[in-house]
Amino acid sequence: MRILYLDPFSGISGDMFLGLLVDLGVDPEKIKSRLEKLNVEFDLVVKKVNKKGVTATKVDVVFPRKEHHEDHIVSDHDHHHHHGRHLSEIVEVLSRLEDPLKEKAIRMFEALAEAESKIHGLSKEKVHFHEVGAMDAVIEIAGAVVGLELLEVEKVFCGTVNTGSGFVMTEHGRYPVPAPATAELLKGIPIYMDQKVRAELVTPTGAVILKILVDEFRTPILRVEKVGYGAGTMDLEIPNVLRGYLGYIEPSERTGDVLIETNVDDMNPQLFGHLMERLFEAGAKDVFFTPIYMKKNRPAVKVSVLCHESKKDEILKLLFKESTSIGARVFYPEKVEATRTLKTVKTEYGEIPVKIASFDSEIVNISPEYEACKKVAQEKGIPLKEVYRAVYKSVSEVRNDV
């Protein structure tokens, strides 16, 4: 599995994350091309900079005839919102992205608005985004989700986040670091406040990248392919860079997941569907039911739930509340999986992504992406199996490329 591990020893911001992606090999022109759908006129200025002896990539989002600003959010209580944008306007812009990227980008902006609305006691629909700062964040957020896809990353991990310390000036006055909205976004994320660095190291955009795009906050065992550095704007006692490792998780690396199982033989069958929905809502990664026979040949259902270890207690509590179970088994599985990469193949119906599985340096499976094939079938008015046939016909091209 190809992963990105973030090492935010000097914090994280939207421009630092974009800089990291470019430093790891993402073509900024491809990001710009993919973001043309937003109908926002902008440019990405990319340059190499030196931060305390570390060469890093700096990416600035620049708009015509407008000064570049650090992204920030203000509420209706602010006296400087004459040219602000509401969340609905931002969502309208981000909705021009393709699925599933737009869903992630919209979730990120909604999280920004929810954090600010909670701090100021407003509904998120009333939160105002400064015009330049808002569009800055739109490009950084959309660029982040597009860049991860271009990097063909399947999972993002992150270490403990350095927020810095001291105070920062906001539209509402002087606040301790991290600023209130940023602190709200950092809930549930492992952080530390470095007292030797008196600066705001995590911006709201950086915090929402961590909140929505990071899958796990731990250090995995990985085989490193590349190390990259995205530069921030400050000159500090430490290099103001976001370090990232691009690599592969070893197939036998423990996932940090738990498997919870319980046998149920006395529950109304109509309740199982609701149980599954609630378990997924609570953060289960997978839920499946297996028909079994218990003692005395009594028919029953084995309920299996896969979740991250941090969700174990919550899942168990829900399982006992929503089912008739009074006990469960908890396993710590070791997952062995093939290394997966995403490639695009050219077919008679256009370019279609495929997932390539390799084990022990040998390709063991090539699988077309179902949703992409389904979309082509619907657009062309042809059977889905015909699209699959075209993909498999072009599969030799992918094998030679891997």
Swiss-Prot record:
PANTHER family: NICKEL INSERTION PROTEIN-RELATED, PYRIDINIUM-3,5-BISTHIOCARBOXYLIC ACID MONONUCLEOTIDE NICKEL INSERTION PROTEIN. The lineage of its organism: Bacteria, Thermotogati, Thermotogota, Thermotogae, Thermotogales. HAMAP family: LarC. Pfam families: Ni_insertion (PF01969). Belongs to the LarC family. Involved in the biosynthesis of a nickel-pincer cofactor ((SCS)Ni(II) pincer complex). Binds Ni(2+), and functions in nickel delivery to pyridinium-3,5-bisthiocarboxylic acid mononucleotide (P2TMN), to form the mature cofactor. Is thus probably required for the activation of nickel-pincer cofactor-dependent enzymes. The keyword Lyase applies. This is Pyridinium-3,5-bisthiocarboxylic acid mononucleotide nickel insertion protein. GO terms for biological process: protein maturation. It catalyses: Ni(II)-pyridinium-3,5-bisthiocarboxylate mononucleotide = pyridinium-3,5-bisthiocarboxylate mononucleotide + Ni(2+). Keywords: Lyase, Nickel. It comes from Thermotoga maritima (strain ATCC 43589 / DSM 3109 / JCM 10099 / NBRC 100826 / MSB8). Its EC number is 4.99.1.12. One of its GO terms (molecular function) is lyase activity.
